[in-house]
Amino acid sequence: MAWFKRDNPPQAKGPAHRVKVPEGLWTKCVSCGETIYTKDIENNLNVCPKCNHHYRVSSKKRLELLLDEGSFTEFDAGVVSVDFLEFKDSKSYQDRIDQALAKGGSKDAIICGSGRIEGTPVQICVFDFSFMGGSMGSVVGEKITRGIERALSDRTPCIIVSASGGARMQESILSLMQMAKTSAALAKLREAGLPFVSILTDPTTGGVTASFAMLGDINMAEPKALIGFAGPRVIEQTIRQKLPQGFQRSEYLLDHGMVDVIVERSKMKSQLSSILTMLYRP
């Protein structure tokens, strides 16, 4: 049995050293489940390189992607939300505003201003979903209306990029009236023969969908964006039926005539420029 003997007895190993991986280095795609180097997603315009899932982006990033470099001028940056009704649920509305401002992004759920898209002058409003879910309150409605009015006075196209959970409940009727206010302003833009292009991104829901977001001369959408009024879960609970596969996604809306075209983020600027060239004459 000597052949079972070892010439060198096993040595006790020291404790294993774990390699510390920085947080956020890798991202697991919420769509395909692949683990991807985060920088690869960021370098791909926040789109998964494996399955083409379009992640949400900030309003500032969206402006960078759509407008010519250095052409953007922001308007109405000083208009901020006020707690008119002294609304309080689990916390006060003012506390929610302060919490959103502390994130260091936008001062409200939208940024508006003027810029150029491949040389064409435009008025543009871009929602920021990170600010209270992109909800539309009196400030959002006012800034959109002013943007439309500037497009009227300057005779330029108007573009609105939506990403919103709908009307801001903390402002009650003051938020709901923004639906009529923005729609009335767009009616004047149409009477003047100036184009309005609505870009629908994930998610576009509630009072935003039920007003200006679906009133575009051209309604564009990003792939697989959630677009609807009530959410699919609420609808299923109400009608007590299972909804069709892909219901309320941009592809479903395209098939049913609610969206004119679906455009990937990387092609959005060039496609938008082509549309403006056809619809707008300075």
Curated annotation (Swiss-Prot):
Q: Which residues does the record give as Zn(2+) binding sites?
A: 29, 32, 48, 51
List the pathway annotation. Answer: Lipid metabolism; malonyl-CoA biosynthesis; malonyl-CoA from acetyl-CoA: step 1/1
Q: How does it assemble?
A: Acetyl-CoA carboxylase is a heterohexamer composed of biotin carboxyl carrier protein (AccB), biotin carboxylase (AccC) and two subunits each of ACCase subunit alpha (AccA) and ACCase subunit beta (AccD).
Subcellular localization(s) per the UniProt record? Cytoplasm
- Does the keyword Zinc-finger feature in the UniProt annotation? yes
Which reaction does this chain catalyze?
A: N(6)-carboxybiotinyl-L-lysyl-[protein] + acetyl-CoA = N(6)-biotinyl-L-lysyl-[protein] + malonyl-CoA
Task: Tell me what this protein is called.
Answer: Acetyl-coenzyme A carboxylase carboxyl transferase subunit beta
Q: Return one GO MF term.
A: ATP binding
Q: List keywords of the entry alphabetically.
A: ATP-binding, Cytoplasm, Fatty acid biosynthesis, Fatty acid metabolism, Lipid biosynthesis, Lipid metabolism, Metal-binding, Nucleotide-binding, Transferase, Zinc, Zinc-finger
Q: Which GO terms describe its cellular component?
A: acetate CoA-transferase complex
In the record, what lineage is assigned to the organism producing the protein?
A: Bacteria, Pseudomonadati, Thermodesulfobacteriota, Desulfuromonadia, Geobacterales
Q: Which cysteines are joined by disulfide bonds?
A: none
Q: Does the keyword Zinc-finger apply?
A: yes
**Cofactor requirement:** Zn(2+)
| Database matches in InterPro entries | AcCoA_carboxyl_beta, Acetyl_CoA_COase_Trfase_b_su, ClpP/crotonase-like_dom_sf, COA_CT_N, Znf-ACC
Q: Which PROSITE patterns match?
A: COA_CT_NTER (PS50980)
What EC number(s) does this enzyme carry?
A: 2.1.3.15
Q: Where are the zinc fingers (C4-type)?
A: 29-51
Q: How is the cofactor bound?
A: Binds 1 zinc ion per subunit.
Cite the CoA carboxyltransferase N-terminal domain residue spans from the record: 25-282
| Species for this entry | Citrifermentans bemidjiense (strain ATCC BAA-1014 / DSM 16622 / JCM 12645 / Bem) (Geobacter bemidjiensis)
Q: Which family is this sequence assigned to?
A: Belongs to the AccD/PCCB family.
Source organism, top-level taxon: Bacteria
Q: What does this protein do?
A: Component of the acetyl coenzyme A carboxylase (ACC) complex. Biotin carboxylase (BC) catalyzes the carboxylation of biotin on its carrier protein (BCCP) and then the CO(2) group is transferred by the transcarboxylase to acetyl-CoA to form malonyl-CoA.
